[in-house]
Amino acid sequence: MSRRNAGAMQREGSVKDWEEFDPSPSPKLAYSQSYVAMRGLLTSVASLDLVLMSSSLKSAWAAISSHKHARSLERSRSKGMSLKRAMLQLLVCFMVGIFIGFTPPFSVDLPGKIASENGRLPFDGDAIDRRQMVERQGTKLEPFVAEAESEASSEPQVEEGPPVPAMLDDEADFVEASPIVHSVNDSGIVVRKHLIIITTTSVRPHQAYYLNRLAHVLKDVPPPLLWIVAEWPYQSRETAEILRSSGIMYRHLICNRNTTNIRKIVVCQKNNAIFHIKKHRLDGIVHFADEERAYSADLFEEMRKIRRFGTWPVAIHVGTKYRVVLEGPVCKGNQVTGWHTNQRRGVSRRFPIGFSGFAFNSTILWDPQRWNSPTLESIIVHSGGRGGLQESRFIEKLVEDESQMEGLGDNCTRVMVWNFELEPPQVNYPIGWLLQRNLDAVVPIT
């Protein structure tokens, strides 16, 4: 054996002996365990770092995503608000456009513009002179020429009175200064004077017949017309029903005076109607229409021609002799020159006509100074006087003489009112119908 082999054997033996008797672990084993432990530690640390990094990334991403979501919500909310604002502005602009589209163009000087464009409509403003309008329009304003001439004449000016009560607001107005019924060119607008018809009535057998007959005549008269019915001693249901069913604008008054004198009762009824006109200052033509008279509808159209006082003839049926007497004016044109009269001898009447033979302007009652009335006392009907003196005294308070009267009915040649004495003065039972005592009972009641 060589020295090299012996040395090798000696090293192996020494190594085996060292390894057999050395209590410490093998250095190769220790290195592998520490490496594994270190590697596990590093792995756990790396995994922990990854977990921490992933959680931080997740939280950061969540924060970023939540911020983005919040910003998107705010952005969507702002977009919604702006959209609503835009829609509201669009709606407002649309409504304003519709309002402007339906509003007709106008100017501040509206009356002057209308008067300049349409000569048929007169205005009494300071900027428009009536005479200049008539000269500029020529024949187009023929209906208003009479009005302008009457205003320039010496006749008293009829100013605008207080407003008519609410019960008359729905009625058509009329031109006071114009004495005729006229139409405004071809527009179809007809201006008529207001008629105020006064009728006295009382409960009696033929009351319904007379009122219905007069109501049918008045219903055929074109409006405006007011029917004032004064009743005594109370407002009966039958009369109220007749007035309601007539289709005419009416006033139902009463005279509750405690008397049995027929003349005083009629005077009370007429004065109550006059006081009603004075109180409300009704403007129109007044006529006392007796319910027992027979009227032609043409008479009421003739009344609208009256400026101050108008009169016409009345035919009176005298008793059972089948004779007719004419009572009323004698005219030359429309000027009253004399009278047809049936008055008795010894009775002198200044104006020999009855209440059914004249009509007058109502402004004489509540403003007589406009017409230079001959009397300053209150214009009422007095109960004194017989044989037509009552009517004559009432007319004397309205006019001075025949020059202030106007004759109607084709120069006072037409008869439009008839007075027929049809109703008996008193309705009684025939003789023998009224028993003074009761009959004796044939079968007594036990």
Swiss-Prot record:
Give residue spans on the Cytoplasmic membrane side.
Answer: 1-85
Provide the residues annotated with a glycan attachment (glycosylation).
N185, N258, N361, N411
The record's region (Disordered) falls at 1-26
Molecular function (GO) terms listed?
Answer: galactosylgalactosylxylosylprotein 3-beta-glucuronosyltransferase activity; xylosyltransferase activity
Question: What keywords sit in the KW lines?
Answer: Cell wall biogenesis/degradation, Glycoprotein, Glycosyltransferase, Golgi apparatus, Membrane, Signal-anchor, Transferase, Transmembrane, Transmembrane helix
List the InterPro entries hit by this protein, alphabetically.
Glyco_trans_43, Nucleotide-diphossugar_trans
| Membrane-traversing stretches | 86-106
> Where can this protein be found?
Golgi apparatus membrane
SUPFAM superfamilies for this protein: Nucleotide-diphospho-sugar transferases (SSF53448)
Stretches in topological domain Lumenal? 107-446
Report the membrane topology from the UniProt record. Single-pass type II membrane protein
Keyword Transmembrane helix on entry = yes
In terms of superkingdom, the source organism counts as: Eukaryota
Q: What is its EC number?
A: 2.4.2.-
Function according to Swiss-Prot or TrEMBL: Probable beta-1,4-xylosyltransferase involved in xylan biosynthesis in cell walls.
Q: What is this protein called?
A: Probable beta-1,4-xylosyltransferase IRX9L
Protein source organism: Oryza sativa subsp. japonica (Rice)
Please name the taxonomic classification of the source. Eukaryota, Viridiplantae, Streptophyta, Embryophyta, Tracheophyta
Query: What is the gene name?
Result: IRX9L
